[in-house]
Regions:
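Glycine-rich, acidic/polar active-site loops that bind/position phosphate-bearing ligands
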Residues: 1-445
């Protein structure tokens, strides 16, 4: 095998009988995009990149500045386990986006995350994230159309009554083949709802793995005549799908968990407490990025194990930030869990803003308020002095407009174009007359 990484990859592609290479990136809204090359074109792509029209991608560029090119990240090479035919394989490379002058594109979500991760590195930290990714599996209706029809009627941790357990195992095996470490998978609370938990890893790799998991889940579901959705609240009256994000900082010199202090009642270091304070400080401002859809705010309501109040605690699952217990002697596992994100978010942007918020808490040494351990769904938040998360996408966008730190983390290109895209969605929803309104008002007024 060659010592040159590019030549080594080309040799690997040939040895694995790869016929096609998918070059993958995401748009500002987090949708995966792919350009497929015959394997014979890979050498040129590695040497010179692959040009594309950025004006055709959501939020990327105006027509007058549209030329961009993809630069494959060689460390992301993997075979796609479900896409092999007649002894020939398809592989995938995740790409960074560059402008014609060779610079990283400021509107590339992966680049935005790299910039914020670099700020953490400058402070002496590596940022680790472990997502818990929830989703629904639905079966088509009698006409073969997509409909929110759960494929089973099991509940939390249940052994499903149909093929769901086998399908989850297929998903986990595919993720393992893709090099992703899955810590657990199980049925969630609602019928047809499932969760896959990934092992913590450095933040850019964690975001890559989150996108890959969404694609894998959808592909395996389709192979089983089902469809998977990461829509936060596809069915009224039941739990929605969240993406709880476990996170920690590691000291780059010692390799020790910077959040851990076994002498603290919560096991938290001063660094961890400042980090949590930063998350709480910017919770409203970053909510539009973490919960980016109109539908997201139908999940963030009382009574369905989703956070509403801006608070933290240990046993309290109604809190926005939770500090999970760790086994005695395993302080390296100390972490905090942010519970408002949902799986429809762009993970590159979501992980960037929450890291920026936490680092702001560290830099400013923000004090952490008292923990809230009671069930906040049944208390008056005003009596506790607790603020609440936005109750709509419109309110979340206004909060984003007022949070300069989150705007800076996104950068001016992504901030402006993300805001424009989501504002259009909000205005479309706000002016839409729903079936509920017609059925409740038409014959009465």
């Amino acid at each position: 095998m060659s010592d040159d990484p590019r030549q080594a990859l080309l040799q690997q592609v040939e040895a694995q009988r790869v016929a096609f290479i998918n070059l993958q990136f995401t748009d500002i809204l987090g949708m995966a995009k792919t350009v497929t090359l015959p394997a014979g074109e890979l050498e040129d792509a590695l040497g010179h990149g692959v040009w594309f029209d950025g004006s055709a991608i959501e939020g990327f560029a105006r027509i007058v500045e549209s030329d961009m090119y993809l630069v494959p990240d060689l460390t992301t090479y993997t075979l796609i386990p479900w896409d092999q035919h007649e002894g020939l394989a398809t592989a995938r490379l995740i790409c960074n986006i560059h402008t014609p002058d060779g610079r990283p594109f400021a509107g590339d979500p992966r680049n935005v995350l790299a910039q914020v991760a670099g700020q953490a590195a400058d402070l002496g930290y590596d940022f680790y994230v472990a997502p818990e990714i929830e989703f629904f599996l639905f079966k088509p209706d009698s006409d073969g159309h997509h409909a929110p029809i759960p494929h089973d009627h099991a509940g939390y941790f249940d052994v499903s009554t149909d093929q769901a357990t086998l399908i989850r195992r297929q998903m986990v095996r595919a993720l393992q083949d893709l090099g992703i470490v899955v810590e657990a998978s199980h049925h969630e609370v609602a019928a047809g709802q499932h969760e896959i938990d990934l092992r913590h890893t450095r933040v850019i790799q964690a975001a890559d793995q989150t996108v890959t998991t969404r694609l894998t889940v959808k592909a395996i579901a389709q192979l089983n005549a089902l469809y998977a959705t990461f829509m936060p609240k596809p069915i009224a009256g039941v739990n929605g799908s969240g993406m709880h994000l476990h996170q920690s900082l590691t000291d780059r010199v010692t390799g020790q968990n910077a959040f851990a202090d076994p002498s603290d009642p919560y096991g938290l270091s001063a660094t961890a407490r400042h980090f949590i304070a930063g998350l709480l400080e910017h919770a409203r401002g970053m909510c539009a990025v973490l919960a980016p859809l109109v539908n997201s705010y139908k999940r963030l309501v009382p009574g369905f194990e989703a956070p509403v109040h801006i608070s933290w605690g240990r046993t309290n699952r109604s809190a926005l930030v939770r500090v999970p217990r760790v086994t005695t002697g395993r302080s390296q596992s100390t972490r905090v869990e942010l519970r408002c994100p949902d799986p429809a978010c762009n993970p590159y942007l979501a992980y960037a803003v929450m890291l920026a918020a936490g680092l702001d808490g560290i830099k400013r040494k923000l004090p952490l308020r008292e923990a809230a351990e009671e069930d906040l769904f049944h208390v008056d938040p005003r009596a506790r002095g607790l603020a609440t998360l936005p109750i709509s996408l419109g309110e979340a966008l206004n909060a984003l407009r007022q949070d300069e730190l989150i705007q800076q983390a996104l950068g001016p290109i992504i901030y402006e174009r993300f805001l424009d895209a989501r504002q259009l969605e909000w205005e479309s929803y706000r002016t839409h007359v729903s079936t509920w309104e017609v059925s409740n008002y038409l014959t009465i007024f």
